[in-house]
C-alpha cells in the first residue's frame, strides 16, 4: 500500500482513503469515534437501520461543530475587544494621559 493511502475498517467494511502520513493517526481515531457514536446511538435508540443512525450521528456532529464555531466566534470577539482596549490604553499611556481600565469586557 502506498504511503499516502490508508485502509480503515468501519462498520465491517474496509475503506481505502488517500491520506497524508501525518494525518493517518487522526483518521483512524476519527473512524473509531464514529463507530463508537453509532454503536452508542443504536443501543440507546433501538434504531437498527445503519443509514438512519448515520444520519442522526451526522446531524449531531454537525450541530456540535456549529456550536464550536459559535464559541470560537464569541471568543474571537472578546479577544478583539481586549486587544482594542489594550491598544487604546497603551496609546493613552504613551501620550501621557491617565489610563482607566474597563474590566466589563474581560
From Swiss-Prot:
InterPro entries given in the database record: Cell_div_ZapA-like, Cell_div_ZapA-like_sf, Cell_div_ZapA_N
BP-aspect Gene Ontology terms: division septum assembly; FtsZ-dependent cytokinesis; septin ring assembly
Gene Ontology CC annotation, any one: cytosol
Tagged with keyword Transport: no
Keywords on record: Cell cycle, Cell division, Coiled coil, Cytoplasm, Septation
SUPFAM superfamilies in the cross-refs: Cell division protein ZapA-like
Source species, domain of life: Bacteria
Subcellular location as annotated: Cytoplasm
Coiled-coil blocks: 22-81
Family designation: Belongs to the ZapA family. Type 1 subfamily.
Subunit note: Homodimer. Interacts with FtsZ.
Role played: Activator of cell division through the inhibition of FtsZ GTPase activity, therefore promoting FtsZ assembly into bundles of protofilaments necessary for the formation of the division Z ring. It is recruited early at mid-cell but it is not essential for cell division.
Record protein name field: Cell division protein ZapA
Amino acid at each position: 500500500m502506498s504511503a499516502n493511502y490508508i485502509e480503515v475498517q468501519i462498520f465491517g467494511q474496509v475503506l481505502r482513503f488517500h491520506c497524508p502520513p501525518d494525518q493517518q493517526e487522526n483518521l483512524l481515531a476519527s473512524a473509531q469515534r464514529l463507530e463508537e457514536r453509532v454503536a452508542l446511538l443504536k443501543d440507546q435508540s433501538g434504531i437498527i437501520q445503519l443509514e438512519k443512525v448515520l444520519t442522526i450521528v451526522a446531524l449531531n456532529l454537525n450541530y456540535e461543530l456549529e456550536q464550536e464555531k459559535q464559541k470560537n466566534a464569541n471568543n474571537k470577539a472578546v479577544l478583539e475587544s481586549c486587544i482594542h482596549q489594550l491598544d487604546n490604553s497603551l496609546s493613552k499611556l504613551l501620550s501621557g494621559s491617565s489610563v482607566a481600565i474597563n474590566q466589563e469586557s474581560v
